[in-house]
Structures are given as structure tokens and as C-alpha cells.
Amino acid sequence: MAIRKFKPYTPGTRQRVVTDFSEITGSKPERSLIVSKHRNKGRNNRGVITCRHRGGGHKRQYRLVDFRRDKKNINAKVAAIHYDPHRNARLALLFYEDGEKRYIIAPAGIKVGQNVISGEGVPIEEGNAMPLSSMPLGSNVHCVELYAGRGAQMVRSAGASAQLMAKEGEYVALKLPSTEVRLVRKECYATLGEVGNSEIRNTSLGKAGRRRWLGRRPQVRGSVMNPCDHPHGGGEGKAPIGRAGPVTPWGKAALGLKTRKKNKPSNKLVVRRRRRISKRSRGGRDS
């Protein structure tokens, strides 16, 4: 997989950088594995906006992805690599020996015709799913379960991987992409290797319209609003916000405020917190 740059024929193509989609082999999704999904456009059940800057975009159908990998000790062949409009990672279509078809998150380097399997005692190969206790130290893994049998909940985005750092008692230590070191029970399943399509981080949309196609609406800076609309608003010209630090439209501290509860039971499983990104390197926008 590689990235594709465009010549500056138009303002939209001047900054545009996209993936070349060379790894995708299937043009149409598996009919039995797609369902319609209601798009709430950032609204809750009462129609009130709870997540701003959402709405519009191209119509999508949801692909049913197997995050549990619960077909144990049954060989599956990779039939195709498909595009998924709901995530940056690609999907691998598996044909199992018993005739069942399933989608999984495509690991980096997986090829059509390759065999994968899940279960205890399976070969240590990329794409195979097994308990964390069966993996050698230093392994890169993705699609990690937090609770055994619940399905993968961590390390699922394109190019992501966690590293198996240590095994001690009933737990193993994983270094997550955020650099946080967390304990996970050893019977939880994970998939060997990293998620494919890592070059997505080097892409650029190039124009506002492509962002609208993805269902993202414009973000208006609070400093250009009126005082009745945002705490940063008002003043003459480009006035400062008049506060010690930036706040949300509802007056709560933004950019750096910890949102994790101090008394959360799973805090004891976090060995080392993720590194804190400075405001300068974060490059965040005015809320």
C-alpha cells in the first residue's frame, strides 16, 4: 500500500494526499454481512444535539465485523480485502471450512489466499487470534479484549498495535498505542500483528468538501461568536478570550482536563498513565 499525491491543478488537489487502495481486492461487500444503520447525526433520542459538527455525508451500510473470533480451531481462508466506510482499517473477508463467512479487521501484510485460525495452541502467525497467555513476550497485537468473551475493544484503528510487555499471575501487561501500560487478564483474546493501512496518517483531505462527504460539518471558532453563543465571544476585533484558559461552549475547562473518574474500579489495572500532550504540540482548535 502507498499514498498518492496530486498535481496542483485545482485548489482542492493541491493539498490532497490519499491512499492508493492497491490492497483492496473486492469491489462489492458480502451481501450477508451488511446491514442498514440509522444515522443519528449527533442527536439523542429527543433530537437534541449532543455531539456537534456531525451530519450529512455519503450514505453507508454497516459491515458486521467479527470482534470475538469465537470460531475456535476452524481454518479460514482470506477471500478478499474490502473497504469499510465506517473505519480507516480495511476488512478481510474470511471463508471458513464449514462454509461460514465473516469479516475481521485486516492485519498488516495479510494476503488473499492466506489461512488464519483462532483458538488455544494455534501457530504464532500474524492474523491468528489466541489468548494473551499463549503469545511470546514482545509480540505486537491488535483487537484486544478487555473482558474475556466480550470481543475486541482496544487497538482496532488503522496502523495501531499494542506490545506484550510482561506476564504475571492472572494478568499480562500491554503497552498501548497511547504509551499507557495496562493490565489485561491472560485469558482475553487478541490478534497477532498490527492493523493494516498505517499510511492513513500521512493523508490529507485537501478540501472542506471531502470532510463533508465523511459526515463532518464545519467547526466555528468560539472567539468569532457573540458573547451569548460562546464564552470566548465578543470584544472588539480579535480580542482575547478573557479567561485563564480555554473553555467549552458551556463554560467547562477544555484542552487538558482529565475526564477519567478518580474512583473508577479499573484504575488499579493502569500501571502507567499515557503521556500528557502539551497544548502546543496538540494543535487543538478554539472550541
Swiss-Prot record:
rRNA-binding as UniProt keyword: yes
PROSITE patterns in the cross-refs: RIBOSOMAL_L2
Biased composition annotated in UniProt, kind: Basic residues: 258-287
One GO location term (cellular component): large ribosomal subunit
Region (Disordered): 221-287
GO molecular function terms attached to this record: rRNA binding; structural constituent of ribosome; transferase activity
GO biological process: translation
SMART domains from the UniProt entry: Ribosomal_L2, Ribosomal_L2_C
Keywords for this protein: Ribonucleoprotein, Ribosomal protein, RNA-binding, rRNA-binding
Alphabetical list of Gene3D superfamilies matching this protein: 2.30.30.30, Nucleic acid-binding proteins, Ribosomal protein L2, domain 3
InterPro entries membership: NA-bd_OB-fold, Rib_uL2_dom2, Ribosomal_uL2, Ribosomal_uL2_bac/org-type, Ribosomal_uL2_C, Ribosomal_uL2_CS, Ribosomal_uL2_dom3, Ribosomal_uL2_RNA-bd_dom
Function description: One of the primary rRNA binding proteins. Required for association of the 30S and 50S subunits to form the 70S ribosome, for tRNA binding and peptide bond formation. It has been suggested to have peptidyltransferase activity; this is somewhat controversial. Makes several contacts with the 16S rRNA in the 70S ribosome.
SUBUNIT field: Part of the 50S ribosomal subunit. Forms a bridge to the 30S subunit in the 70S ribosome.
Family affiliation: Belongs to the universal ribosomal protein uL2 family.
Protein name, per record: Large ribosomal subunit protein uL2
Gene that this sequence comes from: rplB
